Amino acid sequence: MTLFSTLLISVASLLLGSGHATLVFAGDAMQHQSQLDNARRPDGSFDYSHYFSAIEPYIKSADYAVVNLETPIGQKGYSGYPMFCAPAAYAKVLGDAGFDMLLTANNHTLDRRDRGLRHTYAILDSLGVDHIGTYPSPA
């Protein structure tokens, strides 16, 4: 199923109930080094809880919200431009902020090569965040 058809089906199901739908599209969600440094806590964890507080009400008020995840979600060795890699906490806060779907197909998808693509897919699945665009295998 293509991204467009998935989105179309989602919007159609919303319309069946009320006759209208409010959509939010956002991007690019990425991590530059200064953002990583700001979110890093002394114990090595990352706290992004405040990152979307100003726009969270708008995201959550939408019937369906989509954001382009412009960074792989990796393991230790997080980095900003030019080879992005963000911790799982960043993906989690996107879901917590109200985004219903993350788009993963973009020019930074392979910043951490095949392993990063597979890890991103697994992390998003484990967090229960819907995502579309890249897959761990061609099948």
Report each predicted region and the residues it spans.
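Acidic, metal/ion-coordinating pockets
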Residues: F4, V11-A139
